Amino acid sequence: MVEVALKGVTKRWGSFVGVRSIDLVIRDREFIVFLGPSGCGKTTTMRMIAGLEDPTEGDILIGGKVVNDLEPKDRDVAMVFQNYGLYPNLTVYENIRFPLKVRRVDTASHDARVRKAASMVELGDLLARRPKELSGGQRQRVALARAIVREPAVFLMDEPLSNLDAKLRVSTRAQIKNLQ
């Protein structure tokens, strides 16, 4: 993990200000949570860090480097969304492996990395299934494993526990904490 800094970050759409002048430093290995009502800018802030939204003003630094002009793929950020984003035609194994293929990671390491990530979120027995054969909680864990397998510099998670049952929330919280 690396330090993430937001310096005077603002996001506007016309006259509407979605995020107003955020100054924030998230230190290396620090775990933070954005709390607030719907529409207050939590997701927008994470999307700007990930490069999915451009800030209207201010700078975003990852590892001390301004990343405002970098494409999302070049920021070394993994983001887990509330709505999974799984590929329905791929197995759980293939969904987890997908980021490794896209980034052209040495194929010799794929199997071990996929199985380790799947094991971390208790999916080891489900690797041959397709998303339609999984519960909502299992799908969310596939999305989490897909982020874990990348070994990114920064993890962003937008309500990663929202579709999990109470028992899995407890264990998944511990697994997320272990990512630090």
Locations of regions flagged by a protein language model:
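ABC family nucleotide-binding domain
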Residues: 1-172, 178-179
